[in-house]
Each structure stands twice: as structure tokens, then as C-alpha cells.
């Protein structure tokens, strides 16, 4: 019964001394993640309370001055700037037009447990910043041509969808 938390970007900006995402989990394995902090009061990723919590091949970085406590586990990149492809300087807050791919100088390139990059890209699925499912079409329009029908009659619905990815 292992809980796996893979390929995420977690941004902590609260004024607490620790950032708790999981409360006392059992058999939690966090890998290929990027943990970012902006508040100077935050200096560690919670690694307590579970049995066990293991971090592998994850990157930590603080946009302020503190040094983040090293992660347990193996292959971690502690206190390393992720050098994202395109986000505002020193402001990693999520925005749909930010590019969270790793830049060429990032230590997270090819540093994941599978030899791919750490973070939201290069996991088991192709991440989409818009939140659309990657392997399914997404709905862009729905038209009901007969919105009042007697019981047992057909309701005519036309759907328009777009493919999320093209081959």
C-alpha cells in the first residue's frame, strides 16, 4: 500500500516554519518533484509523521535567503535553482502562461528516477497547463437544438471538441 507522489511542482509561500502537504501518511514515496519556497520562514519539506516518508530524485529551492533542510532518500538535488524555461524572476507562482519546463542549465534535467527531467513534465503523462486531459478530446461547444421535449422523446445535442495533442 505505497502512496506515490510523482512529477509535481509544489510552491510554498506561507509564513510557517514547515510546509505540510501530507499528514502522517504511511509508505509515502515522493519522487521527481520540485519543491519551491518563497517565504523566509519556510525552510523544510515535511518528512515526519509518516511511516516512512521517502524523497527520491527531487529538487528543492528557496527564492529567498534560507537554506532548505536536505531531503532524505537518494538522488535529491537540495537547494538547486530549477532554472525554469520562462517564469517571472523570483516569482514561481502558478500562471497558465508560465513555462515550467526546465531550462538548459537546470540540475533537474535528466535527474528523475526514470532518467527524465524532474517536475511536471516528463512524467507518466504529458502535462498540459490548461488542465485538459492529454489523451482525450476536450469540449469546446455544446448546442441543444430542442431544449423542450416531451418525456420519452429524443433530446438533440451537438458537441464540438478539439484534440488536445496532435500527432
PLM regions and their residue ranges:
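C-terminal accessory segments
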Residues: 73-132
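Generic short alpha-helical hydrophobic face used as a protein-protein interaction/packing hotspot
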Residues: 37, 62, 112-113, 163
Amino acid at each position: 500500500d505505497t502512496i506515490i507522489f510523482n512529477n509535481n511542482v509544489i510552491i510554498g509561500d506561507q509564513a510557517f516554519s514547515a510546509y505540510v502537504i501530507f499528514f502522517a501518511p504511511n509508505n509515502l514515496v515522493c519522487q521527481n518533484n520540485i519543491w519551491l519556497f518563497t517565504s523566509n520562514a519556510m525552510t523544510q519539506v515535511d518528512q515526519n509523521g509518516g511511516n516512512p516518508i521517502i524523497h527520491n530524485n527531487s529538487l528543492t529551492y528557496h527564492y529567498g535567503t534560507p537554506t532548505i533542510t536536505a531531503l532524505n532518500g537518494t538522488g535529491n538535488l537540495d537547494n538547486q535553482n530549477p532554472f525554469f524555461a520562462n517564469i517571472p524572476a523570483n516569482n514561481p507562482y502558478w500562471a497558465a502562461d508560465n513555462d515550467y519546463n526546465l531550462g538548459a542549465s537546470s540540475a533537474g534535467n535528466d535527474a528523475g528516477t526514470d532518467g527524465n527531467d524532474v517536475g511536471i513534465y516528463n512524467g507518466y503523462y504529458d502535462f498540459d497547463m490548461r488542465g485538459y486531459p492529454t489523451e482525450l478530446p476536450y469540449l469546446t461547444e455544446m448546442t441543444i437544438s430542442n431544449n423542450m421535449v416531451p418525456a420519452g422523446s429524443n433530446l438533440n445535442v451537438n458537441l464540438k471538441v478539439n484534440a488536445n495533442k496532435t500527432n
